[in-house]
């Protein structure tokens, strides 16, 4: 079981620039990674495995389309919060950040921007809740 060694000093007091929402979203994601990813990811990588429970976990913390309106399964978070969420997923494993950002940015965002209302209703909520 790998130890979570993340303990980075904030030399430039960057945390002071973040809103309470930014910090809350970062900390929720960080805790999920620390609890669910860090203990098993090294072994999974060494065995060429991807724990698919991670997909449900990312959905549970709102990691698919979090910047979209609630009507479509998002939480309407700002882009700073989204970036902090992606940073924390990346800290756990690059594949997690890729999974979330590709589904959110290249799939869901395009449906939201260019899809009909019916397409948005048909696809965005199921994609945010991994009910494909």
Predicted segments with their positions:
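Mature N-terminal segment immediately following signal peptide/propeptide cleavage
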Residues: 19-34
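Short basic coil micro-motifs at the edges of alpha-helical modules that engage polyanionic partners
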Residues: 14-15, 22, 47, 74
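A short, ordered amphipathic alpha-helix with a cationic face
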Residues: 1, 29-30, 95-99
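Intrinsic disorder at enzyme termini
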Residues: 1-21
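Glycine-rich flavin
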Residues: 37-132
């Amino acid at each position: 079981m790998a130890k979570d060694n993340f303990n980075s000093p904030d030399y430039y007091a960057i945390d002071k620039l973040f809103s309470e929402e930014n910090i809350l979203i970062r900390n929720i994601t960080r805790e999920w990674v620390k609890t669910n990813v860090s203990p098993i990811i090294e072994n999974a990588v060494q065995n060429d495995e991807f724990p698919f429970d991670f997909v449900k976990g990312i959905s549970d913390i709102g990691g698919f389309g979090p910047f979209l309106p609630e009507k479509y399964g998002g939480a309407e978070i700002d882009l700073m919060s989204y970036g902090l969420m992606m940073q924390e997923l990346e800290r756990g494993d690059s594949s997690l950040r890729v999974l979330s950002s590709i589904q959110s940015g290249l799939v869901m965002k395009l449906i939201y921007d260019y899809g009909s209302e019916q397409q948005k209703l048909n696809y965005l909520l199921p994609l945010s809740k991994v009910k494909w």
